Amino acid sequence: MKDIYPASPEWRVSRWFNSEAPLSLGALRGKVVMVSAFQMLCPGCVSESLPQALRVREAFSEGDLAVVGLHTVFEHHEAMTPTSLAAFLHEYRITIPVGVDEANPCDPIPVTMQAYAMRGTPTTLLF
């Protein structure tokens, strides 16, 4: 059967946390995938979307559903470094894999955030 919809763009991630190897949509094909795009300084992300992602992770088996965080920094870049993110993930006990959206050298909006036309955080994507 021919696919009638174009494939979703692959994530462009500069670094992974809580994952032994890089993740990709292609590698997760056949599973339902939930992506929680967030910024660690976003109040709604910290109070709502990340706890929701963790609850979803606990509710479904890993064989049926992949839950992935995507740290999409589009403001306050100097405060949201990978070192700061590592401390944040530890402090808030975020155990799902988290990728850092690749920075765009020509724009403050990171690459994956642009590819999916996200308008801000939090954003939840389902594949």
Language-model region placement:
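N-terminal "domain-start" segment that seeds a small globular fold
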Residues: 1-26, 96
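Proline-centered helix-kink/hinge sites
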Residues: 9, 43-44, 51, 97, ...
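Residues that form or immediately flank small-molecule/cofactor binding pockets and catalytic motifs
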Residues: 15-18, 30, 72, 103-104
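Short active-site neighborhood of thiol/selenol oxidoreductases, capturing the structured segment around
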Residues: 22-49, 53, 67
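Loop/turn elements at helix/coil->beta-strand transitions in domains of secreted/extracellular proteins
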Residues: 30-33, 63-66, 93-97, 121-122
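Catalytic metal- and UDP-sugar-binding loop of GT-A-like glycosyltransferases, i.e.
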Residues: 37, 70, 127
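Structural microenvironment flanking redox-active thiols in thiol-disulfide oxidoreductases
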Residues: 46-92, 103-110
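Thiol/disulfide oxidoreductase modules built on the thioredoxin-like
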Residues: 92-94, 101-127
